[in-house]
């Protein structure tokens, strides 16, 4: 049994001039035990101008969260520069390369994923999801953005995570949403 604590689904979208990120509250120990149902995996950073969410090993994610926030301050809130510098440090450090987590970061202008391999990815369609329910949330979000375009970014973020929670056993309905 894998005894690491894991946190799961995060979804983010930029749509109609707004951006929203949603995350569920479930933390799982291994494959069978829910340790916490109300974790807050989506947070505001840098004077509330940046929203970040994590999926993966909880301890690893908090380490990356703290490192990313330090990079944000070091580069005066420049989201892409902070993400790239974090990724460079992540790739270049033997200990950091062992971390099992991913981040989604966004501000009013950009949406990025910082992957577990130290890559920075900007989605083509301003929509992204990570974690065990990520593919379900991403599918729902893309369908809603395409076929229900009058919905707000917040509404799409909510519905996408609800869909993932209905399907993925590692995602629950305790959803936190942050909007910019």
UniProtKB/Swiss-Prot annotation:
User: Is the keyword Hydrolase assigned to this protein?
Assistant: yes
Q: A single GO CC term, please?
A: HslUV protease complex
Residues annotated as binding Na(+) are: 165, 168, 171
Taken from the record, one Pfam family name reads Proteasome
Residues the record marks as active site: 8
InterPro entries named in the record: ATP-dep_Prtase_HsIV_su, Ntn_hydrolases_N, Proteasome_sua/b, Proteasome_suB-type
Q: What is its EC number?
A: 3.4.25.2
**GO biological process: one example:** proteolysis involved in protein catabolic process
Under Gene3D superfamilies, the record lists: Glutamine Phosphoribosylpyrophosphate, subunit 1, domain 1 (3.60.20.10)
Q: Which residues cross the membrane?
A: none
Q: Which GO terms describe its molecular function?
A: metal ion binding; threonine-type endopeptidase activity
Q: Which cysteines are joined by disulfide bonds?
A: none
Extract the PROSITE patterns matched here. Answer: PROTEASOME_BETA_2 (PS51476)
Q: Which UniProt keywords apply?
A: Allosteric enzyme, Cytoplasm, Hydrolase, Metal-binding, Protease, Sodium, Stress response, Threonine protease
Q: Which reaction does it catalyse?
A: ATP-dependent cleavage of peptide bonds with broad specificity
Cellular localisation: Cytoplasm
Q: Report the principal subcellular site.
A: cytoplasm
What is known about regulation of its activity?
Allosterically activated by HslU binding.
Note whether Protease occurs among the keywords.
Answer: yes
Member of which family? Answer: Belongs to the peptidase T1B family. HslV subfamily.
Q: What does this protein do?
A: Protease subunit of a proteasome-like degradation complex believed to be a general protein degrading machinery.
Subunit annotation? A double ring-shaped homohexamer of HslV is capped on each side by a ring-shaped HslU homohexamer. The assembly of the HslU/HslV complex is dependent on binding of ATP.
Which protein is depicted?
ATP-dependent protease subunit HslV
Task: Please report the organism this UniProt entry assigns to the protein.
Answer: Macrococcus caseolyticus (strain JCSC5402) (Macrococcoides caseolyticum)
Q: What is the lineage of its organism?
A: Bacteria, Bacillati, Bacillota, Bacilli, Bacillales
């Amino acid at each position: 049994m894998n005894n690491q604590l894991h946190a799961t689904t995060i979804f983010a979208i930029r749509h109609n001039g707004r951006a929203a990120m949603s995350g569920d509250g479930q933390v799982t120990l291994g494959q069978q035990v829910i340790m916490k149902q109300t974790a807050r995996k989506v947070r505001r950073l840098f004077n509330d101008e940046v929203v970040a969410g994590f999926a993966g090993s909880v301890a690893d994610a908090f380490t990356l969260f703290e490192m990313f926030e330090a990079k944000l301050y070091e580069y005066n809130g420049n989201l892409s520069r902070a993400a790239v510098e974090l990724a460079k440090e992540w790739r270049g450090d033997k200990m950091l390369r062992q971390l099992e987590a991913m981040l989604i970061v966004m501000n009013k202008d950009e949406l990025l994923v910082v992957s577990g391999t130290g890559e920075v990815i900007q989605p083509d369609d301003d929509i992204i999801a990570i974690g065990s329910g990520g593919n379900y949330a991403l599918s729902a979000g893309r369908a809603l953005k395409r076929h229900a375009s009058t919905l707000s970014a917040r509404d799409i973020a909510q519905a996408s995570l609800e869909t993932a929670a209905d399907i993925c056993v590692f995602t629950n309905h305790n959803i936190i949403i942050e909007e910019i």
